[in-house]
């Protein structure tokens, strides 16, 4: 939920000035795009394709909202409603990030392909350029805990105020939590090839590789964030124990980081048809990359933390096909090293948060069975079952709060939060006519952990959808869809402010109010698409 008045005060990270953000500032975005798609068939059998696109978004803004913890306050704590009356009861700490950006990119891909006997060859070239000019500002606020929350104000001392005089404010904690800034570009120039080799009528081998020259040049602010953080030379102020005002000098300026690296990827896939309908398949892929420009918008990796990200994937299984069924069952292993993430850690029972830079690994072993079923004319069913176990590796962090207390989080070998171990998809569709179809979609998400240390979790739940699509003619399409058909209620995702809660401490929160995301309620949507 957001502030009712539609606007709020914040500290601009770039200018260091207090400004007002209106809700529409995050909606009025603009982008222009032009594309060229072409191909040419040579007489000698080679096929040439060229795809090019240029996009410019001079305004690419959006707003993020998050929560922290829920606590109970008394009138003596000084919280007031907008009419000036004192408030007592439950409050939720709220967090907001305002993202302001300008983006442009130019993408070019050209390929040559040809069938040579039992080889299907393809060689291609990528030239991808991306430019980003981006910053974000953050602040905190408090809302009442009720059906229609109201914004609260309280006494706040701005660390940029040399008099250290308290004033009433609805927003506070300016730029303490992960404000971001970067400006620069990245360029990817790559050469790649693939070969689909039909060794025998029953045995097929597919392999390929890609080599990429990657250049990134970005402005980065590696300094830790704090209340009142912004670019420039300035002072923050605090009151000492003896009542004197202490000034602290800051000089915050971006520094350029330039990297020239080689990324690579390779893949190998084998398929063997035991019979005309049944077969075996296996494949292995490895892909690498170095940190992207977007990962320098925060404090970014240091030189010691700048490492290659490696993503290996290995899987194998069986498949079966006939006139009405296409079935496959695969076991998959995948991992990813050196993930870069900024994690906001909240002190349990309070709304105080700190941001830390984390570099960690993820790996998962899973089994997926999927089926495409066409039992009778005009009816199609997609079905999927997945069991997986995604876990964190090398996930350790510690943070020191304002009272001097240091707390740590250790998520090693813990299940990745927000990712269920069991997934089920059921998607039936019936084509009433050539241009009119009805569809349903059922999604089951199994038990899902809501924090990093497996202390809190949500039970499994179903999400349901349905609708009708009508292609009126080549220019007009109409549709109606229903979300949450059975109006299921509940929570999902994560629980705000729970990052540092351990399994041993989870019992303390039984019967306590906590905040997070809820299932989208029963909704009916109508849509129309017009093509010229």
Language-model features, listed with the residues they occupy:
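Structural signature of Gram-negative outer-membrane beta-barrels, strongest in the C-terminal barrel
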Residues: 103, 118-120, 126-128, 180-336, ...
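Acidic/polar loop-and-plug regions of large Gram-negative outer-membrane beta-barrel proteins
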Residues: 1-37, 59-97, 152-179, 184, ...
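Gram-negative outer-membrane beta-barrel transporters
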Residues: 201, 326, 333-337, 357-452, ...
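Membrane-embedded beta-barrel scaffold of Gram-negative outer-membrane proteins
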Residues: 41, 47-53, 273-281, 285, ...
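Conserved C-terminal beta-signal and adjacent last beta-strands/turns
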Residues: 309-316, 380, 414-532
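Transmembrane beta-strands of outer-membrane beta-barrel pores
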Residues: 54-60, 116, 127-133, 211-217, ...
């Amino acid at each position: 939920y957001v502030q009712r008045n539609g606007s709020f005060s914040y500290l601009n990270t770039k200018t260091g000035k207090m400004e007002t953000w209106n809700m529409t500032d995050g909606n009025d975005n603009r982008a222009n795009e032009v594309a060229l798609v072409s191909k040419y068939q040579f007489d000698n059998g080679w096929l040439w394709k060229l795809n090019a696109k240029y996009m410019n978004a001079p305004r690419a803004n959006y707003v993020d909202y998050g929560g922290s913890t829920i606590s109970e306050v008394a009138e003596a704590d000084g919280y007031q409603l907008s009419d000036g009356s004192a408030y007592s009861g439950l409050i939720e700490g709220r967090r907001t990030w305002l993202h302001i950006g300008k983006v442009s990119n130019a993408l070019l891909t050209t390929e040559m392909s040809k069938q040579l006997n039992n080889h299907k060859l393809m060689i291609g070239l990528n030239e991808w350029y991306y430019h980003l000019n981006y910053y974000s500002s953050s602040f905190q606020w408090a809302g009442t805990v009720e059906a229609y929350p109201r914004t609260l104000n309280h006494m706040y001392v701005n660390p940029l105020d040399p008099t250290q005089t308290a004033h009433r404010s609805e927003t506070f904690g300016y730029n303490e939590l992960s404000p971001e800034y970067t400006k620069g570009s990245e360029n990817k120039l790559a050469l790649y090839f693939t070969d689909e080799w039909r060794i025998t009528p029953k045995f097929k081998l597919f392999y390929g590789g890609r080599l990429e020259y990657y250049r990134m040049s970005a402005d980065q602010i590696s300094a830790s964030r704090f209340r009142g953080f912004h670019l420039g030379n300035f002072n923050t102020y605090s009151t000492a124990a003896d009542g004197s005002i202490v000034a602290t000098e800051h000089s915050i300026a971006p520094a350029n980081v330039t990297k020239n690296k080689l990324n690579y990827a390779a893949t190998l896939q084998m398929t063997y048809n035991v019979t005309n309908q049944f077969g075996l398949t296996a494949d292995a892929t490895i892909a690498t990359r170095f940190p992207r420009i977007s990962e320098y918008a925060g404090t970014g990796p240091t030189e010691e933390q700048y490492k290659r990200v490696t993503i290996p994937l290995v899987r194998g299984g069986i498949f079966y096909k006939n006139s009405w069924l296409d079935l496959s069952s695969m076991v998959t292993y995948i991992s990813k090293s050196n993930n870069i993430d900024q994690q906001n850690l909240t002190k349990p029972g309070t709304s105080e948060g700190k941001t830390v830079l984390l570099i960690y690994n993820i790996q998962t072993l899973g089994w997926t069975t999927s089926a495409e079923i066409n039992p009778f004319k005009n009816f199609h069913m997609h079905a999927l079952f997945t069991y997986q176990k995604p876990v964190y590796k090398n996930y350790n962090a510690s943070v020191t709060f304002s009272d001097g207390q240091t707390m740590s989080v250790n998520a090693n070998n813990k299940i990745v939060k927000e990712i269920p171990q069991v997934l089920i998809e059921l998607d039936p569709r019936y084509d009433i006519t050539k241009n009119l179809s009805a569809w349903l979609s059922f999604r089951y998400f199994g038990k899902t952990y809501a924090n990093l240390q497996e202390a809190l979790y949500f039970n499994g739940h179903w999400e349901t959808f349905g609708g009708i699509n009508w292609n009126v003619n080549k220019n007009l399409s109409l549709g109606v869809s229903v979300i949450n058909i059975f109006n299921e209620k509940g929570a999902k995702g994560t629980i705000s402010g729970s990052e540092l809660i351990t399994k041993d401490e989870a019992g303390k929160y039984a019967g306590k109010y906590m905040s997070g995301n809820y299932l989208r309620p029963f909704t009916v949507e109508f849509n129309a698409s017009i093509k010229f």
